[in-house]
């Protein structure tokens, strides 16, 4: 585990940095999760072992610091991650964002576009959260209510319903971080995250689990020409359910993007 000091928050973000000679991949987890919890088994697969893989715990989550005066909005997470990416001098970067980590990934790409080769999202939030989503239910509490008793209520309900993995990692979040990020999810982005995704002029791919389908986002993304991948026999928590296949699909996407870029370069040289 390593740590990165965020000056304007006087706080440390902690992360794991697995070495590799191939292009780097930065993994951004979703609400209630942590890179240190979600992606260790993914990046240990043979198909990714040559890539430099960086697993972060966002501020407020996992092993990172949990400042109470931070607003925990998507754009605020993206801002310190931009500085983090620059501090590591990352280039030719693939950014992988899951669920509510998807909007953070999208906004981060926009902030450091010249450093990013590909954006991969797994079942991302693209529009404001609606009833039925965890973030919507959490945001229905006032912040005081959630800190006083709502956080414990969500943890208990997750445990008793059998969602024990999420309960385990959620328990290491700051209640303030959970609530403020959830409220932002319900508000949506100043510019919708869907529009930001569509406007990005880089290769991008969105992954869904077969058990999550049918899904309105899948249909709309397919209709709008966004490349999609489906992993069989998994749902939303795909990195826990089948880390081997998540790794393989990620590797295949990166390889395919590289081959397309090389083909484009060779074609331009030939035409010249």
Predicted features and spans:
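Conserved catalytic-core motifs of eukaryotic protein kinase domains, centered on the activation segment
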Residues: 32, 37-39, 64-70, 130-133, ...
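Conserved serine/cysteine hydrolase catalytic core
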Residues: 176-230, 239
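Conserved HGGG/HGGXW glycine-rich cap/lid loop of the alpha/beta-hydrolase fold
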Residues: 9-63
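Conserved alpha/beta-hydrolase catalytic His-Asp/Glu region
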Residues: 130, 134, 144-199
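Active-site loop/oxyanion-hole signature of alpha/beta-hydrolase fold enzymes
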Residues: 54-96, 248
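Flexible "cap/lid" loop of the alpha/beta hydrolase fold
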Residues: 106-111, 116-147
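Catalytic histidine-centered segment of alpha/beta-hydrolase-like enzymes
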Residues: 234-247
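Gly/Ala-rich beta-loop-alpha elbow adjacent to hydrolase catalytic centers
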Residues: 97, 101, 105
